[in-house]
Amino acid sequence: SNPTSTPEITETPMPTESTEPTETPEPTPSPEPTSTPTPAPTGKLYERVPGIEMPGEKVNGHEYIGTLSIPSLGLKVPVQRNWSYENLSVSPCRYSGSAYAGNLAIIAHTYHFGKLSSLALDATVTFTDMENNVFRYVVREKNTISPNDANEIAHSGYDLTLVTCTL
């Protein structure tokens, strides 16, 4: 192939010597160092507002709102949006409330929550929603209630309430 154009040759000027001193610029102040910002959560941000619905995801006909983890008991289980006796046979279920409103109540059969009675005070419990927002809780109290007092579960006043049958 033939070139379509030939580049022109230009003369490069030679630098000239300067005997006059050049002015030194005044230093500009540097900004003060600041602490490294905390990275934003990986999930979407949420507002702690009563009534806000937790996102869910359907898997095998059941809708899940997140995962409950209790490291000291070696427990990590999915949590279903709505409770029913059928759903309880699959996994723990939300009984009422929301992590977003600060009143989440989760119930489960003893084959999921059977070790709750051995959960130590000050143990850490986490709930991770379907958008990867992580809610950390610390165990402050353990109570036994009568089946007739189930209304106490929904109105416990706690950010998280975990419930199972006693053995």
Residue ranges of each PLM-predicted region?
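Solvent-exposed, non-transmembrane regions of membrane-associated and secreted proteins
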Residues: 1-167
